């Protein structure tokens, strides 16, 4: 597996948060369809194993980028490395992100600042850096948000706000790029069966038993297909689609109170 050799491929995709969950499933879909990949995540060994597996399974080329997007310098470092290697992107997938559950008065600012950096700043920065070459190659941007983007989220206030930002950013950018040959898609899944809930300290919330849970492979497939069709927003699962439509016509205060009941710990 290459960590430094340049690519000479017609289609290359960068996927952040590629070591598990939606990002990993998307990596399989892109590799299956002949994309060469740049995979970004924090753990070098995990990335190397994933890269080796994808190369063997799909006969494609994988470049790993072991970086932590919580570090503000990471997007610039990656951009410079790819420039020096002659790698040009056709697709950017901003998938990296995490949540943090709890009352805002009790959660850690250090964790929330890191979440803002990863979920919002890094995704925006990477888009700013790579969009010129994606536009020149008439490529695509796929931002992974959440149905959390459509309403406030008491007891996950900052996380919900980061996803609302991603949705708004994606829709605005899609409109700016209308007619340019570049599509911007925002994937907004509901609860997904991944390690996200554990990292977000969501054990004990009603969300853990939500009937809206969708399989991660299905989420990735719908996001990938929606991106290829140039859809601006993709919401996997008919229950989630109906739910979002109801959110849009319901009083915001009432919606917020419902979300509070869902997010609150059962023993609170």
Tell where the protein language model's regions lie, with residue ranges.
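Conserved glycine-rich cofactor-binding loop
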Residues: 19-21
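Conserved glycine-rich Rossmann-like NAD(P)H-binding loop of the short-chain dehydrogenase/reductase
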Residues: 33-50
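Conserved NAD(P)H cofactor-binding loop of Rossmann-fold oxidoreductase domains
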Residues: 95-100
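Substrate-binding pocket helix/loop in short-chain dehydrogenase/reductase
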Residues: 103-116
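Active-site helix of classical SDR
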Residues: 127, 162
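Residue(s) in the substrate-gating loop at a strand-loop-helix junction
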Residues: 146
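SDR active-site lid
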Residues: 168, 176-239, 253
């Amino acid at each position: 597996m290459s960590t430094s050799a340049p690519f000479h491929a017609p289609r290359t995709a960068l996927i952040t948060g590629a070591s598990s969950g939606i990002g990993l499933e998307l990596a399989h879909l892109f590799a299956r369809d002949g994309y060469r990949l740049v995979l970004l995540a924090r753990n070098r060994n995990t990335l190397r194993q994933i890269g080796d597996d994808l190369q063997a399974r799909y006969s494609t080329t994988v470049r790993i980028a072991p970086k932590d997007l919580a570090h503000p310098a990471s997007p610039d470092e990656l951009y410079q490395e790819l420039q020096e290697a002659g790698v040009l992107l056709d697709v950017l997938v901003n998938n990296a992100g995490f949540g943090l559950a709890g009352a805002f008065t009790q959660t850690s600012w250090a964790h929330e600042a890191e979440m803002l950096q990863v979920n919002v700043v890094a995704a925006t920065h990477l888009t700013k850096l790579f969009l010129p070459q994606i536009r020149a190659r008439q490529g695509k941007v796929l931002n992974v948000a959440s149905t959390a983007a459509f309403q406030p989220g008491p007891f996950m206030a900052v996380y919900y706000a980061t996803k609302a930002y991603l949705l708004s950013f994606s829709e605005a950018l899609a409109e700016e790029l209308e007619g340019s040959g570049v599509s911007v898609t925002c994937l907004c899944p509901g609860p997904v069966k991944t390690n996200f809930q554990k990292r977000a300290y969501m054990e004990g919330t009603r969300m853990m038993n939500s009937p809206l849970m969708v399989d991660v492979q299905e989420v990735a497939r719908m996001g990938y297909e929606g991106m290829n069709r140039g859809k601006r927003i993709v919401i996997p699962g008919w229950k989630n689609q109906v739910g979002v439509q109801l959110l849009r016509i319901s009083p915001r205060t009432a919606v917020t109170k419902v979300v509070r009941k869902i997010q609150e710990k059962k023993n609170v």
